[in-house]
Amino acid sequence: MENSLSLDLTKTKPYVEEHEIQYLESIIREMDNTLGKKTGPGNKFLGWMDLPINYNKEEFARIKKAAEKIKNTCDVFIVIGIGGSYLGSRAAIEMISNTFYNNLEKNQRRVPQIYFAGNNISSTYMADLLELVKDKDICVNVISKSGTTTEPAIAFRIFKELLEKKYGKEGAKERIFATTDVAKGALRTLADLEGYETFVIPDDVGGRFSVLTPVGLLPIAVSGIDVDEMMKGAADARQEYSSDNIEKNHVYRYVAVRNALYRKGKTTEMLVNFEPCLHYFGEWWKQLYGESEGKDGKGIFPAAADFSTDLHSMGQYIQEGLRNIFETFINVENPRKSIIIKEDKENLDGLNFLAEKDMDYVNHQALRGTVLAHNDGGVPAIVLNVPELSAYYFGQLVYFFEKACGISGYLQGVNPFDQPGVEAYKKNMFALLGKPGYEDMKATLEERLK
């Protein structure tokens, strides 16, 4: 096993003391046992727990084969999905690939350009994307359990039409890959009818926990990331976080501290990074915790920030605003690349004290200074140390946060594996759009909106 993630809770004191963590050990162990024995709420959606070792090896091989086909066939790869159907793969690709991967020349990329669609309903976004890719060789991966989720369904209808006009029906079917339910749903029916190659979203894995299934694996493999290493990282994390000793299990300690802080009125957790490539990891994390914990009038509100950028916008609030915040810093110990700051003879900017230092050294001092400043201002700080940004550690991070999320949800007395609240806006939208069966509701809503 390679070096693992490590957790530094020094700057959560004096807000949470060690004895408070110890007091929570038995209840956290009980919640973990509930997960493991599959006796708690949402127990039909716990397939993610053993996924790193129990994944479908035959399908995994097909995914890698399909990824090679896409890389050899297409200039552009369009990933159509929303929420858990795209955030995990985008988080991995942005974290591990070149920051400007889509702008590199093809011989530098060695993989297609990758764009995401179906995660909004903006006509401008879609029109701009079509304008960008229409004259290029295109492959599409449409990801939807049902095939009727509005945003990806609209996007796929548009791209299906484009590909069929461009390549004909036979040519299009060779370039469309569907990730969907094993047997039912509109997308499964369409894929079988048209003859698309398909990959299965497991019945026992919910969308926000699905990045290590074909949902995330195909786009990640197309990007050139080593999915074997990613699964190895997740498998090693699964083994490491199986300990029921809170002194040894970082998941237990993270769950204990964030919930102790929540009980003391720290109701907002900010996941903070100092690497721009972690932005979409924060977006993935927000969905994971927001949908899992935010119900029954409870839950820690998940927010994310990109430092040092957001220190120049949100820094004032974090330092001196309402004291309901705690932060979880992702500290990347070793950057992918280095840049040395050179000496300037004139030194008009006064930066020669940084001469011959790596930019990453400056970045780390910014992180350390921020932790101290915010802590002095009444904001507890959890620091999660990550040795490097690689496929292996992406797998570790995913499993760390997924397991912590499941335990934490049970600790808060909610079902962390459902999301009943997301249907409310959809019903209103369908009624306002005039979907059949919503006529009475439409009239009521239109009256309320006057």
Swiss-Prot record:
CC terms in the record's Gene Ontology section: cytosol
Key words of the record: Cytoplasm, Gluconeogenesis, Glycolysis, Isomerase
Compartment(s) of residence: Cytoplasm
Pathway noted in the entry: Carbohydrate biosynthesis; gluconeogenesis; Carbohydrate degradation; glycolysis; D-glyceraldehyde 3-phosphate and glycerone phosphate from D-glucose: step 2/4
InterPro entries recorded: G6P_Isomerase, Phosphoglucose_isomerase_CS, SIS_dom_sf, SIS_PGI_1, SIS_PGI_2
Active site: 291 (proton donor), 312, 426
Function: Catalyzes the reversible isomerization of glucose-6-phosphate to fructose-6-phosphate.
Alphabetized PANTHER family for the sequence: GLUCOSE-6-PHOSPHATE ISOMERASE
HAMAP family associated with the record: G6P_isomerase
Protein's name according to its UniProt entry: Glucose-6-phosphate isomerase
Source species of the chain: Clostridium botulinum (strain Langeland / NCTC 10281 / Type F)
